């Protein structure tokens, strides 16, 4: 039997049209829509298992518009982890992530302890690429976050994206325990090298 149940809040940010909703819908529902429908804000839940506990991923798909700064701040303050999405076909969409990243730093403080993924979506449109993966990798190193390219359309690296985000959380949670006594749960996790599994 699972020991506990808790919510883990993930906020997805990015400019309009980069595929935030497509990534979330592909992960949660396994679907992809060709048409672009602007999002104000949607929340989805996905249950995952992590060792012997059940965790509910609460994924907030935020607006790509700059008209709702209060909603953006609220999503950051409530979030446990962040996915910053740009389109590899739009350099501007990568540039637009910088103020969002800065706001996460401002609200959350030490971002080294927070799982953040920089995601280059639409890698199926490689002939129209404006952002090289090496450039995004360099930015991710500067921001001290992880990097991955995805395609919601082809279902490429979508599940892996959320899996990696959870792995970052586990690694960072474990690393925070080194200066004090580790709990039995932490010892068990390290002994088993257990991982959160996306169902």
Curated annotation (Swiss-Prot):
Membrane topology: Lipid-anchor
Cytoplasm keyword on record: no
GO molecular function list: GTP binding; GTPase activity
CDD domains in the record: ARHI_like
Top-level lineage group: Eukaryota
This enzyme's EC code(s): 3.6.5.-
PTM summary: Ubiquitinated by the ECS(ASB11) complex via 'Lys-11'-linked ubiquitin chains, leading to its degradation by the proteasome.
Modification sites for Cysteine methyl ester: 196
Name of the protein: GTP-binding protein Di-Ras2
UniProt gene name: Diras2
């Amino acid at each position: 039997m699972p020991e506990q149940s808790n919510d883990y809040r993930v906020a997805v940010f990015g400019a309009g049209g980069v595929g935030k909703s497509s990534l979330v819908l592909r992960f949660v529902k396994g679907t992809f829509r060709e048409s672009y429908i602007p999002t104000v804000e949607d929340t989805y839940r996905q249950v995952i298992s992590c060792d012997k506990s059940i965790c509910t991923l609460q994924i907030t798909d935020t607006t790509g518009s700059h008209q709702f700064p209060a909603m953006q701040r609220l999503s950051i303050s409530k979030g446990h982890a962040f996915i910053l999405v740009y389109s590899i076909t739009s350099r501007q969409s990568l540039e637009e992530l910088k103020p969002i990243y800065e706001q996460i730093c401002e609200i959350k403080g030490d971002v080294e302890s927070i799982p953040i993924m920089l995601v280059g979506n639409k890698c199926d449109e490689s002939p129209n690429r404006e952002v090289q993966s090496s450039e995004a990798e360099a930015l991710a190193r500067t921001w001290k976050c992880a990097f991955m390219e995805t395609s919601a359309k082809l279902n490429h690296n979508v599940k892996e994206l959320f899996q990696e985000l959870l792995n970052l959380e586990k690694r960072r949670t474990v690393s925070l325990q080194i200066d004090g006594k580790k709990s039995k749960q932490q010892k068990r996790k390290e002994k088993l090298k257990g991982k959160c599994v996306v169902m």
